[in-house]
């Protein structure tokens, strides 16, 4: 059971960050997957947060090294758009926020990209595809 304020690594490079007072959850590897996959990351809320406030939140993330994203050519005149795709399943259909950050850009800056995605049908695996436009600023360090 996970609760409190922290960030924990769960499964295969996936990190879960959260700020909760009374809420608790478990993270497990599941065999409930979209076609073609062996396992998925499953988050079960075991105790709902009793009082949400402006600092309450949760996020699932994956840290990707700069050497793995050089093909984006971010911050150059040859910058290319890139695509983030993932499968998602939830017991609640609706619109959810998505963001990612690129840390440690040239000059020490950080780039954040914010958008939303929609889960159309509850309890159904759906593939989501997010395309990010070309970015001519902030070269990604090669590390």
Regions found by a protein language model. Name each.
Residues 1-143:
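Extracellular and organelle-lumenal recognition/adhesion modules and their flexible linkers in secreted
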């Amino acid at each position: 059971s996970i609760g409190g304020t922290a960030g924990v690594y769960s499964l295969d490079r996936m990190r879960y960050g959260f700020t909760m007072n009374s809420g608790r959850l478990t993270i497990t590897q599941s065999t409930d997957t979209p076609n073609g996959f062996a396992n998925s990351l499953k988050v079960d809320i075991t105790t709902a947060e009793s009082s949400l406030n402006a600092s309450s939140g949760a996020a699932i993330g994956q840290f990707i090294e700069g050497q793995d994203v050089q093909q984006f050519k971010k911050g150059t005149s040859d910058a290319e758009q890139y695509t983030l795709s993932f499968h998602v399943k939830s017991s609640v259909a609706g619109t959810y926020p998505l963001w990612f950050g690129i840390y440690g850009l040239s000059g020490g800056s950080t780039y954040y990209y914010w958008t939303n995605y929609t889960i159309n049908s509850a309890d159904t695996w759906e593939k989501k595809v997010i395309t990010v436009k070309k970015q001519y600023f902030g070269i990604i360090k090669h590390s």
